């Protein structure tokens, strides 16, 4: 698959007005999303990855083939993404609540965030194509679902070490085949960092630290093309994104991104 994208920085003061404009353009209300994103890097050379028996036993055969191709092709960072809810933030494991003397244990257990029930998908995104002369950013991408629960041993079996994690917070709109995402990156507070492991639970949302200290957001408009070998389809996709750019030019300036700023290769 190929992803074609345009990007625009959005100051915090413009966030609300742009949400309203995007709602009008797409004729839909914003779909609020929260994603927990774990970053992994390979510790083995390309072509050497051999999953341990049982490491991917819950993944069906087509997914195993896709994973093999995705994770065995080169030294690239990959992200493991889990969708979470607003109510997942600030909930502790029940064992912690019990230790702290919580009196409403039943309700705590029902509503708490449990990483063992977290579903995941692996996202691979290549460095954007070079020398295309295109007005949009284009790059090869691939995604695959993986088992629930503790993802670190699964990724270890594929030859990947955990590096870091963050939360993507934003609003999504759909316009025909274009996904429009107005979002920002939130880092975990220092006290929630574990050596070599993701956090066991999500801190309160208000304790998360914006990557952009000014509170700014990033607007990304993307179209994913399944048949990247079809030049007419690729051209039509570019034209649709440029049409959206023209439509929104009074509010934001959508542009292609600097290629090296999206470099996912392991240095």
Curated annotation (Swiss-Prot):
GO terms for biological process: regulation of transcription by RNA polymerase II; termination of RNA polymerase II transcription. It comes from the Eukaryota. GO terms for cellular component: core mediator complex; mediator complex. Transmembrane segments: none annotated. Keywords: Activator, Nucleus, Transcription, Transcription regulation. Pfam families: Med18. GO terms for molecular function: transcription coregulator activity. It is found in: Nucleus. The keyword Amino-acid biosynthesis does not apply. Belongs to the Mediator complex subunit 18 family. Component of the Mediator complex, a coactivator involved in the regulated transcription of nearly all RNA polymerase II-dependent genes. Mediator functions as a bridge to convey information from gene-specific regulatory proteins to the basal RNA polymerase II transcription machinery. Mediator is recruited to promoters by direct interactions with regulatory proteins and serves as a scaffold for the assembly of a functional preinitiation complex with RNA polymerase II and the general transcription factors. Component of the Mediator complex. PANTHER family: MEDIATOR OF RNA POLYMERASE II TRANSCRIPTION SUBUNIT 18, MEDIATOR OF RNA POLYMERASE II TRANSCRIPTION, SUBUNIT 18. This is Mediator of RNA polymerase II transcription subunit 18. The gene is SRB5.
